[in-house]
């Protein structure tokens, strides 16, 4: 069963449409997957739905809720295998069977070990014709955050940097306002909305005193602000600490941090996260594992060169966005996106795959995934 997939152009068309619907959940459903569903009868869409926010109805149930027509004998396209367990919501397989759906076209099997293939099995036992794997590569790319998180319980890490044409993230004086233009900075706000956590090192907090919130108009889910700060040096008067009651803020530190300072931070609403120590600094692998355990499935790394270098050296970066501004600032003391000693040979350089390049205002945005 399922070996000879009878996939038509129509199947691909409707699955891609379901994928577009799924994307509407971006920034709202984490750590759940992005899922879209479409109900089709005689080549015509009669209902659609997507997973809109965490804890809300799944895509399939939203589609049924939105449906004004008879679903008996119809086909459902869903980007991810319907769930078959009672979680925050009842299983979707029940709804599919109850509504008399005759054929289900599934994009991806659920990578969650508690589900994997069981939902499809239940549908087939109920006499429903199930096709699996339509547009699966595109869907894996769309749900790359969820796929890594559900399999490893480790957050997906995206490194963002903005640099001049000669690779500087600030002038030698430390001044960095602004490397890129308004459209690029606006794009960064869009990106911040997408991920569950924004991360910087203590050096960035001292140098820039950032807010690290998402400043888009309208309703957005604010990311958790995370500072990698071994000695808990972050200033009590910094924006991150003074706004911690409003925006969830975590300071990751090691055991040698001053306990009085940690108590003061806690009193201001900052969550303190004790991590293992590695060479006098926070062990980033341990920190990511702990953040994953807290339900944080993705990190937008906006750190300085030191933190970026630690992540890169430990193979912790999954994806890169690099904004390059058409300007030269010079200076051998001027900071670069990745500091440290670096690799000795070009053959050791970390390469990107699936590279995309676009103009954002006057700046160039290079985006790619890290070769694994």
Locate each region found by the language model.
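Short, Lys/Arg-enriched N-terminal segments with co-localized hydrophobic residues
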Residues: 1-5
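Enzymes that bind and transform nitrogen-containing heteroaromatic metabolites
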Residues: 7-17, 21-25, 30-32, 71, ...
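A short, flexible N-terminal coil/short beta segment enriched in small residues
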Residues: 18-22, 42-49, 138-151, 241-245, ...
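Proteins enriched for Cys/Gly/acidic motifs involved in redox and nucleic-acid/cofactor modification
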Residues: 27-29, 56, 120, 134-162
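Helix-turn-helix
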Residues: 36
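Zn2+-dependent cytidine deaminase-like catalytic core
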Residues: 39-139, 224, 250, 257, ...
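Short, well-ordered coil/turn segments that N-cap beta-strands
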Residues: 102, 128, 153-155, 196
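Short capping loops/turns at secondary-structure boundaries
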Residues: 112-116, 132, 150-154, 177-181
């Amino acid at each position: 069963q399922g070996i000879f997939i009878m996939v038509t152009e129509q199947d691909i068309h409707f699955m891609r449409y379901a994928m577009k619907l799924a994307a509407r959940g971006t920034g709202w459903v984490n750590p759940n997957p992005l899922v879209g569903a479409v109900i089709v009868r005689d080549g015509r869409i009669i209902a659609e739905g997507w997973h809109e926010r965490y804890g809300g109805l799944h895509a399939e149930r939203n589609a049924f809720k939105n449906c004004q027509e008879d679903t008996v004998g119809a086909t459902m396209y869903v980007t991810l295998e319907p769930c078959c367990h009672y979680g925050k919501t009842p299983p979707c397989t029940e709804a599919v069977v109850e509504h008399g759906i005759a054929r289900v076209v599934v994009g991806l099997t659920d990578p969650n070990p508690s589900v994997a293939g069981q939902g499809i099995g239940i549908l087939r036992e109920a006499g429903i014709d199930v096709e699996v794997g339509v547009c699966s590569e595109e869907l894996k790319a769309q749900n790359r955050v969820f796929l890594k998180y559900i399999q490893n319980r480790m957050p997906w890490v995206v490194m963002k940097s903005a640099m001049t044409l000669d690779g500087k993230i600030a002038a030698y004086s430390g001044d960095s306002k602004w490397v890129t233009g308004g459209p690029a900075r606006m794009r960064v706000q869009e990106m911040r909305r997408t991920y569950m956590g924004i991360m910087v090192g203590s050096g960035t907090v001292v140098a820039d005193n950032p807010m690290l919130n998402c400043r888009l108009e309208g309703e957005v889910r604010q990311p958790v602000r995370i500072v990698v700060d071994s000695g808990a040096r972050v200033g009590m008067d910094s924006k991150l600490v003074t706004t911690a009651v409003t925006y969830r803020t975590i300071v990751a530190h090691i055991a040698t941090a001053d306990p009085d300072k940690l108590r003061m931070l806690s009193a201001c609403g900052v969550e303190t996260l004790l991590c293992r120590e590695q060479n006098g600094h926070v062990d980033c692998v341990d920190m990511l594992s702990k953040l994953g355990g807290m339900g944080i499935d993705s990190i937008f790394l906006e750190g300085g060169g030191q933190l970026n270098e630690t992540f890169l050296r430990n193979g912790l970066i999954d994806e890169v966005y690099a904004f390059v501004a058409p300007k030269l600032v010079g200076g051998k003391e001027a900071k670069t996106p990745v500091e440290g000693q670096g690799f000795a040979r070009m053959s050791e350089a970390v390469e990107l795959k699936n590279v995309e390049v676009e103009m954002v205002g006057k700046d160039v945005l290079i985006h790619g995934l890290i070769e694994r």
